[in-house]
Amino acid sequence: PMPNKTQSQTAELEKPTRVRYKVAVLTVFLAMITYLDRVCIATLAPNIMAEFTLTKVQMGYVFSAFALAYAVFEIPTARYADRIGTRAILARIVIWWSVFTMATGMAFNFVSLLVARFLFGAGEAGAWPSVARTFGRWVPKKERGTLQSFFFSAAFLAGALTPVIVTWLLGIISWRIVFILFGCSGLVWALIWSLWFRNEP
């Protein structure tokens, strides 16, 4: 029997293209950027605490601000990605959190640092759900598990290497410039993503 229109459309959506490899590379780089930006503050905390004369409790609030925002905004951002597509949402949220990564380096007291990290967490919250949706559109089911493993491994590798990178950078530049430098990496990624990626194969 001849396939109906719905079957043909489904087959076309499931037909893999080589472009998915480029999507995979971009998302793996994004995984690394997410952990680079979120983990770096742990190594930079002593420098920040010394400059602002913060207590350990205050620094704990700064860490918690990120986690709270991440928890609150993850589901709403994922729903937004389902509605408008991941091309727009990932570009926007990566720009958002990159700006607030840089804003962390421009903080001038405890409150400004707290706000910057909260808004940074709000941006990062939607990254992984949006990437999962991207995989669902671009990657065949039989390859998604493998790609997810690369994605997670890249994130955790970046998390492991970030303290080493940050320690080395602190010998050259200030803690403030480290945040600005890391924020710029996200802006570059967002530009490439928004210019190249499309929501559907």
Identify what each model region corresponds to.
Residues 2-36:
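Cytosolic juxtamembrane N-terminal segment immediately preceding the first transmembrane helix
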Residues 22-56:
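Extracytoplasmic
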Residues 53, 85, 106-112, 123, ...:
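Helix-breaking motifs and short loop linkers at transmembrane-helix boundaries and internal kinks
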